[in-house]
């Protein structure tokens, strides 16, 4: 047989063998196109598991009439134009093959309108040469793609489709993954005329946990530990489930994204597994929803036909970065909580209200229960939040679901040794260790609190500063030092070097480890609260402060560091506020008894109440 150029339809069908595996593959490609077009709402209609109909409608920017024919051509795209673009891809699609491949194995119709056009246009390809026909149509700004009779002209491919239910489950899973990647987009999914999923867009902040719970379930939400980890151009955020409470059902939740693109990457999975291996059994798997952001120049996404895998230019650095981030939040969660004081605890005691609220609703009343091993969460670093705080981000959280959280809080820790009965005291004494219930957030950084009928305002940045100081101040043992993935090397003067050497023992108690030579100092480890700070700014400022001191007390240094740390929250959510106050109540009980003026201010409602009654 002589060498010959294949007809366009046959060439597209060959390409479709890589891109279009099943109906879910079509949905993935088309929804990603909608996201690249800037859509904020995407409606997906499926019939018979996608074999009969796949319809994707969005409100994106649309496609111009003159470009509709090109949109259905192979290797035609608006997302890259040069090799430099290919090496720094930020869009989800870039090859320009999807529409041509899909149209070659189905009856595809593309209808679109841009904001500049007065009318919409419809395009479809047919025949051996895939000639494109364009005609007027009625359509709002945006694009609709209809894929009818998938694999109608390739019986062998159609024969390998599974049952309608199985194929739709694959589509449902794809939409779940996409919904987790884009919290700012409303996505609805219908099957055979019935709405099956509806994920509404949520703003930044605590509302994200609402969608997380809707997609991954309350079981994952209960055990979710938040991660915020950064180094240079690398950022890791998301949630990982507490390995001590991972179940086979939870282990199915393994979602990872690189620059917003869903991935199944062995390197990432290995790093997460390695971080959790000491807490997981041999037959257990970690559960996680993680987002890795990296300089697009440092990752190659053009290595897999369906773009499910990537190749990192510095794979070892990425692996260790993810490993350190996950390990850090797990170690923090498993730390032994510090006692509130040396006095014995009363037998029946009130749970701090913010912890009860975390399990039921925002306005839960104080609850009294028998003493059990408390599931205290360590102070959060880098924005991480204990599992019990997540439901507070969900307005109108259902009471029945809250029962699960209350049972979780009342479950004794298995390793805790039973204590002998102690004298009972009124529960009101323990309740004095609580600031009260968080009602709402005011002016983005103040919490409105209610306690015993009294209203007060609490400054969240000030509370965060006190918490950081408590975390940094060494107790009977020094603060745990966290090795830096990449040590920080700084040039110092002779005076600064002398001050550092004098303060070395005090800094070691704070978890700051360094090594100095003739003109440089290398910071090798810092305490956990400093890991997410910009150390290239903070450490030189700390060295300058030490150079002006004659006495080096760990407490004074911890106070200075706490005052100079950058807040991780430009705008606070309810969940973050409740978590913060719960940790302040645990580590800084003296602030509850005698709060400083800059932390807490009472709000007098009596004049307003009197004015209302006088009316």
UniProtKB/Swiss-Prot annotation:
Pfam families: DNA_mis_repair, HATPase_c_3, MutL_C. Disulfide bonds: none annotated. The keyword DNA repair applies. SMART domains: DNA_mis_repair (SM01340), MutL_C (SM00853). It comes from the Bacteria. GO terms for cellular component: mismatch repair complex. GO terms for molecular function: ATP binding; ATP hydrolysis activity; ATP-dependent DNA damage sensor activity; mismatched DNA binding. Residues 373-391 have a biased composition (Low complexity). Gene3D superfamilies: 3.30.230.10, Histidine kinase-like ATPase, C-terminal domain, MutL, C-terminal domain, dimerisation subdomain, MutL, C-terminal domain, regulatory subdomain. InterPro entries: DNA_mismatch_repair_CS, DNA_mismatch_repair_MutL, DNA_mismatch_S5_2-like, HATPase_C_sf, MutL/Mlh/PMS, MutL/Mlh/Pms-like, MutL_C, MutL_C_dimsub. Residues 362-397 are annotated as: Disordered. GO terms for biological process: mismatch repair. This protein is involved in the repair of mismatches in DNA. It is required for dam-dependent methyl-directed DNA mismatch repair. May act as a 'molecular matchmaker', a protein that promotes the formation of a stable complex between two or more DNA-binding proteins in an ATP-dependent manner without itself being part of a final effector complex. HAMAP family: DNA_mis_repair. Belongs to the DNA mismatch repair MutL/HexB family. This is DNA mismatch repair protein MutL.
């Amino acid at each position: 047989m002589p060498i010959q150029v294949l007809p366009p339809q046959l060439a597209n069908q060959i390409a479709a063998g890589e891109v279009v595996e099943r109906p879910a593959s079509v949905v993935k490609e088309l929804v990603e196109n909608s996201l690249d077009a800037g859509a904020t709402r995407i409606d997906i209609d499926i019939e018979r598991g996608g074999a009969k109909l796949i319809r994707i409608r969005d409100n994106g920017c649309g496609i111009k009439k003159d470009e509709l024919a090109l949109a259905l051509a192979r290797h035609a795209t608006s997302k890259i134009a040069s090799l430099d673009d290919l090496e720094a891809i930020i869009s989800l699609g870039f090859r320009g093959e999807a529409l041509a491949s899909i149209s070659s194995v189905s009856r595809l119709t593309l209808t679109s309108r841009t904001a500049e056009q007065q009318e919409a246009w419809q395009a479809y390809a047919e025949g051996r040469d895939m000639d494109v026909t364009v005609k007027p149509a009625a359509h709002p700004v945006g694009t609709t793609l209809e894929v009818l009779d998938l694999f109608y002209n390739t019986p062998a491919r159609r024969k390998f489709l599974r049952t309608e239910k199985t194929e739709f489950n694959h589509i449902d899973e794809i939409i779940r993954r996409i919904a987790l990647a884009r919290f700012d987009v409303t996505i609805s999914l219908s099957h055979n005329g019935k709405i099956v999923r509806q994920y509404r867009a949520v703003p930044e902040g605590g509302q994200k946990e609402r969608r997380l719970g809707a997609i991954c379930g309350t079981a994952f939400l209960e055990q979710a530990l938040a991660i915020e980890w950064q180094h240079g151009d690398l950022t890791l955020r998301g949630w990982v489930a507490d390995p001590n409470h991972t179940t086979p059902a939870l282990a199915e939740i393994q979602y990872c994204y690189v620059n917003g693109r869903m991935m199944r990457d062995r390197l990432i999975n290995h790093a997460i597994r390695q971080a959790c291996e000491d807490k997981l059994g041999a037959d257990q798997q970690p559960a996680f929803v993680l987002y890795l952001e990296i300089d697009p120049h440092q990752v190659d996404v053009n290595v897999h036909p369906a773009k499910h895998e990537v190749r990192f230019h510095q794979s070892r650095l990425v692996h260790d970065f993810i490993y350190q981030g996950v390990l850090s939040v797990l170690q923090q969660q498993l730390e032994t909580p510090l006692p509130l004081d040396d006095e014995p605890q009363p037998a029946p005691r009130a749970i701090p209200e913010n912890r009860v609220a975390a399990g039921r609703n925002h306005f839960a009343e104080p609850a009294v229960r028998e003493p059990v091993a408390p599931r205290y969460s360590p102070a959060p670093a880098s924005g991480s939040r204990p599992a019990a705080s997540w439901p507070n981000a969900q307005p109108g959280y259902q009471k029945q679901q809250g029962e699960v959280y209350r049972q979780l809080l009342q479950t004794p820790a298995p390793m805790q040794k039973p204590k002998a009965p102690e004298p009972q005291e009124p529960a009101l004494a323990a309740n004095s260790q609580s600031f009260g219930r968080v009602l709402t957030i005011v002016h983005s950084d103040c919490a409105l609190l209610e306690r015993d009928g009294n209203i007060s305002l609490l400054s969240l940045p000030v509370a965060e500063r006190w918490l950081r100081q408590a975390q940094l101040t060494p107790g009977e043992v020094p603060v745990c030092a966290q090795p830096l993935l990449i040590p920080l090397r700084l040039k110092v003067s002779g005076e600064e070097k002398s001050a550092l050497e004098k303060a070395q023992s005090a800094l070691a108690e704070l978890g700051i480890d360094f090594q100095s030579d003739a003109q440089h100092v290398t910071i090798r480890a810092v305490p956990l609260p400093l890991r997410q700070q910009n150390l290239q700014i903070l450490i030189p400022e700390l060295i300058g402060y030490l150079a002006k001191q004659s006495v080096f007390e760990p407490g004074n240094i911890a106070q200075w560091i706490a005052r100079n740390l950058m807040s991780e929250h430009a705008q606070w959510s309810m969940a973050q506020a409740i978590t913060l106050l719960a940790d302040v109540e645990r580590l800084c009980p003296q602030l509850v008894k005698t709060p400083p003026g800059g932390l807490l201010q009472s709000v007098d409602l009596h004049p307003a109440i009197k004015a209302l009654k006088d009316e």
